[in-house]
């Protein structure tokens, strides 16, 4: 990947803010790392790219830009071409993919397609330079995105993990975490208002995507209709919601660590000790059962089913079983709770 070069603007408070954040978290974007940056051309990803270009000389990164064309509107190919020309004028390596018709019909499939393509490109960069593998994929998500996600998940119905989603760092592939490619969101401490100012002050171009105004996408409606009302009632609420999501993320991580310790104590050769598990409050039993299923590789269950199992193994309840998806079955005997899997 080529190094970037641009006319250096004066060091700004925005540069200092991200720079100090990275110094305080040296493992987030290590010095001299190979970084693959997802850039749509919108203000958030362009603000991230502009800051990284200027900080590159201090951190020694290798930068490559990836652009995903969802093929949602007629201007998408033009945006891809103009962004490519801008990157090349700044000596930035650039690659892009265009989705096939029907491949990105909604927000979920579009997100899956993007992360799949980013994973493939990161693996390509690593195979081309095995001594300098690409293990970091960056996106321009901000605290505003995090607040939107919290509201959407809350409205749909979710658990603690859903409310604490959009972490600063996670494996990019939830299905294949062993691939060792991390998804990094360096701008979660910045708001959408911040990224607009960054682009303005650094003279960065912005490509407006008509899809961001499409009311068929639930996130757009939250962004354009819900959050403005909440901000007018309680200014700064987006930042507070994002901060709450971060605290919930830490709480969820703590809960997971404690649950793993508890499961180790409850584990026996043929499953979990039913007697000890049954002595716990039903909410604690339900939480431990969820982590036990996840650790065992079983499919996740809706809260209703988890509570059903938890109630069924309470003291005085008879033995029983419950068939799960994909050939899994939970059964509880007098002394144990067991998990079986048949292809």
UniProtKB/Swiss-Prot annotation:
GO BP: any one term: tRNA modification
Principal subcellular localization: cytoplasm
Catalytic activity field: cytidine(34) in tRNA(Ile2) + L-lysine + ATP = lysidine(34) in tRNA(Ile2) + AMP + diphosphate + H(+)
UniProt keyword list: ATP-binding, Cytoplasm, Ligase, Nucleotide-binding, tRNA processing
Binding annotation for ATP: 40-45
Compartments in which it is found: Cytoplasm
GO CC annotation: cytoplasm
Entry's family note: Belongs to the tRNA(Ile)-lysidine synthase family.
Protein name as it appears in the record: tRNA(Ile)-lysidine synthase
Gene: tilS
């Amino acid at each position: 990947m080529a190094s970037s070069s641009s006319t250096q603007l004066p060091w700004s408070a925005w540069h200092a803010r991200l720079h100090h954040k990275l110094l305080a978290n040296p493992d987030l974007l290590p010095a001299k790392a190979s970084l693959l940056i997802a850039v749509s051309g919108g203000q958030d990803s362009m603000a991230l790219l502009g800051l990284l270009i200027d900080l590159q000389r201090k951190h020694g990164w290798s930068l490559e830009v990836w652009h995903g064309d969802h093929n949602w509107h007629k201007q998408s190919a033009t945006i891809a071409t103009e962004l490519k020309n801008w990157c090349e004028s700044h000596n930035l390596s650039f690659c892009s993919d265009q989705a096939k018709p029907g491949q990105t019909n909604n927000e979920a499939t579009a997100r899956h397609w993007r992360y799949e393509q980013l994973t493939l490109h990161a693996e390509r960069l690593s195979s081309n330079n095995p001594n300098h593998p690409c293990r970091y994929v960056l996106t321009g998500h901000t605290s505003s995105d995090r607040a939107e996600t919290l509201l959407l998940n809350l409205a749909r119905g979710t658990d603690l993990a859903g409310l604490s989603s959009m972490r600063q760092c996670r494996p990019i592939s939830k299905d294949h975490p062993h691939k060792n490619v991390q998804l990094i969101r360096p701008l979660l401490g910045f708001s959408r208002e911040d990224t607009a100012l960054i682009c303005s002050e650094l003279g960065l171009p912005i490509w407006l995507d008509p899809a961001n105004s499409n009311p068929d996408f639930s996130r757009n409606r939250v962004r354009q209709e819900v959050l403005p009302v909440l901000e007018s009632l309680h200014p700064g609420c987006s930042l507070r919601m994002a901060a709450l999501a971060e605290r919930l993320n830490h709480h969820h991580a703590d809960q997971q660590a404690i649950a793993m310790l508890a499961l180790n104590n409850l584990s026996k050769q043929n499953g979990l000790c039913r007697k000890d598990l049954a002595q716990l409050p039903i909410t604690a039993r339900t939480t431990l059962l969820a982590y036990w299923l996840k650790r065992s590789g079983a499919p996740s269950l809706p809260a209703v089913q988890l509570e059903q199992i938890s109630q069924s193994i309470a003291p005085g309840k008879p033995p029983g079983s419950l068939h799960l998806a994909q050939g899994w079955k939970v059964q509880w005997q007098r002394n144990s709770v067991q998990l079986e899997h048949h292809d």
